[in-house]
Each structure stands twice: as C-alpha cells, then as structure tokens.
Amino acid sequence: MFQPLSSKPSFPHRHLLGIAGLSAQDLTILLDLAEEAIEVSRQVEKKRTSLRGRTLINLFFEASTRTQSSFELAGKRLGADVMNMSVATSSVKKGETLLDTAMTLNAMRPDIIVVRHAQAGAVHLLAREVDCSVVNAGDGAHEHPTQALLDALTIRRNKGRIEGLIVAICGDILHSRVARSNILSLSALGARVRVIGPSTLLPTGIEQMGVEVFRDMREGLVGADIVMMLRLQRERMDGGFIPSLKEYFRFYGLDEEKLALARPDALVMHPGPMNRGVEIASRVADGPQSRIREQVEMGVAVRMAVLEALSQHLPNG
C-alpha cells in the first residue's frame, strides 16, 4: 500500500491515545501517510495487505456512525479481520468493569483495539492493561485524535499549508473533545487558533492552551481562514447553558451573513453530526465554501494511515 516506513521517518508510538504528546513531526508523518491512503481509496482495487492476518476490534461504548464505520472500512481496506463489539449486548451491560473487559479482550489476542468511551481517560486505562496497540476514537470530553488529524488533512489539502492560518473553532467548546484535539494539533502545526462561544460553553482557563478567546462570534470570525463549527452536545449538558436554540443560532449559528466576515476564501468545516438551524444554516453547510463532505472521505484515509503506522509496532510487523 504505502512505501515502507523504514524509508522515511517512522511513527514512534505504539498507541494513538491523543494528540497531546505528539510532535509536529509525528503529526506530519500521519498526514503524509494519509495522503497516500487517499490515492489508494480512489483506486478501483482498494484492498491492501498491510494488516492481513491481523485482528482489529472496534469497542464502542458510545453510539457512533461515522467513526466506527470509518475504522471498520479502514481496517478492511488494509486486509484486517475486523470485529465490531456491540456494547449494548455485551457483558458491559451486565455489570462488567472496563478493566474486566480489557482482560477479556486481551485474552483474545487482538492486534489493535479501537475504543470510544464516555469517560475521559478510559482509553489510557485500557492501554495499560492490554498487550496490543490501542487507538482512541473519543474519550469523554478529553480527546478525539483521528478527527483532529482528518481536519488537519482537509485544511492542508485545500490550503496547501496549515502554518500561519487563522482557524476559528465555534460553538460548544466546553464539552467538545474535537475542539481540544484540534487546538493541540493545529497549534503544533503552526496555525493561530481562536475559540468562539458563550461564556457558559467555554472551559475555564482555555486561554492557557494558547488560543484567542472570543465571546462575540462576529468579532471572532473577522479574517478567519477556516471556520470550524461544533454541535451543541446536549446529551452532556445538565443545566441551562443556553437560553434557547433559537437564541443560540441568532448569536452563534453560522449563516451567510456571519460567514462573510471571514476571509472570502474561508472554508467551512464541521465534524458531524450537524444540527442544521442550530449551529449552522443549511445554505452554508451545503454551500461552495463547505468542506464537510470532504472531511468524511479524509476520515477513512486518516484511519488507514493510523492503523498502518501502528502496524509497524506489532510483533513481526
């Protein structure tokens, strides 16, 4: 599939647990591999053998459509045997702890486990207890590294660079693992990152991550090269974070009028799923500046790249 990693800098990590701890070079290695994976995915014959004979387990404790199916497709395109573990019908629903689940899965001798869990840090716990490689597919409000990678890839392919760009991340920053991972990755790659949202949806001390903070969306969008919208994660809210959805859209929903404040060639992105009419207007989501559908294609390529990179650390890999 790809050129042997020995001919270029190799990804030095056995797991992908987050963007935190990765260098700009680590990120670039994965993005470059993903560029090659895009070409593979666009061929008639998409099947490769990098993971032939290997077992990939998708262990999702939270519902997912895009991420789980993307990892499944990525694994199959690399030749892996892919098992999707349904938590709804598993021992977890019968009271089994995460540690017990980890020990059970480890006894099956998988090569890579992809995990999504509602608890921040759960993926790190599991990685300490298993012998295989572990990929974080989202842990609580902590991180979502492959989403950040596919967003960076989308930006780089459209703009030709990331360094020096102004990226405005707008919406529910407080509950968003996507926001955290994107802040870490884009900052490491040289972008200027802004976060925009009401005070109730901005984490305390977010400035310490090196971002510019705006509570006025119009002010925050001025001169932006990339506008990245986030959905309201109402399933993680237990109080009155916003007065109403109508008021939220009025002040923080991306419509054509607000988008006009960004650069004329600004790109619009969204990790999905979208709430049309809440954080983004349909005319913007489906408009010429939108790269939302392209992000989905980049997701498969990035996850192929991650699995390929980790395969170099598997026994006899």
Swiss-Prot record:
Keywords annotated in UniProt: Pyrimidine biosynthesis, Transferase
MF annotations from Gene Ontology: amino acid binding; aspartate carbamoyltransferase activity
Positions annotated to bind carbamoyl phosphate: R66, T67, R116, H144, Q147, G272, P273
Pfam family, one: OTCace
InterPro entries listed in its UniProt record: Asp/Orn_carbamoyltranf_P-bd (IPR006132), Asp/Orn_carbamoylTrfase (IPR006130), Asp/Orn_carbamoylTrfase_sf (IPR036901), Asp_carbamoyltransf (IPR002082), Asp_carbamoyltransf_Asp/Orn-bd (IPR006131)
Family assignment from sequence similarity: Belongs to the aspartate/ornithine carbamoyltransferase superfamily. ATCase family.
Residues holding L-aspartate: K94, R177, R231
Function statement: Catalyzes the condensation of carbamoyl phosphate and aspartate to form carbamoyl aspartate and inorganic phosphate, the committed step in the de novo pyrimidine nucleotide biosynthesis pathway.
EC number: 2.1.3.2
Domain of life per record: Bacteria
GO biological process terms held by the UniProt record: 'de novo' pyrimidine nucleobase biosynthetic process; 'de novo' UMP biosynthetic process; amino acid metabolic process
Oligomer status and interactors: Heterododecamer (2C3:3R2) of six catalytic PyrB chains organized as two trimers (C3), and six regulatory PyrI chains organized as three dimers (R2).
Residue ranges of the TM segments: none
SUPFAM superfamilies associated with the record: Aspartate/ornithine carbamoyltransferase
Species of the source: Beijerinckia indica subsp. indica (strain ATCC 9039 / DSM 1715 / NCIMB 8712)
Pathways involved: Pyrimidine metabolism; UMP biosynthesis via de novo pathway; (S)-dihydroorotate from bicarbonate: step 2/3
Record bears the keyword Ligase: no
Catalysis performed (reactions): carbamoyl phosphate + L-aspartate = N-carbamoyl-L-aspartate + phosphate + H(+)
PROSITE patterns registered for this protein in UniProt: CARBAMOYLTRANSFERASE (PS00097)
Recorded GO CC terms: cytosol
Protein name: Aspartate carbamoyltransferase catalytic subunit
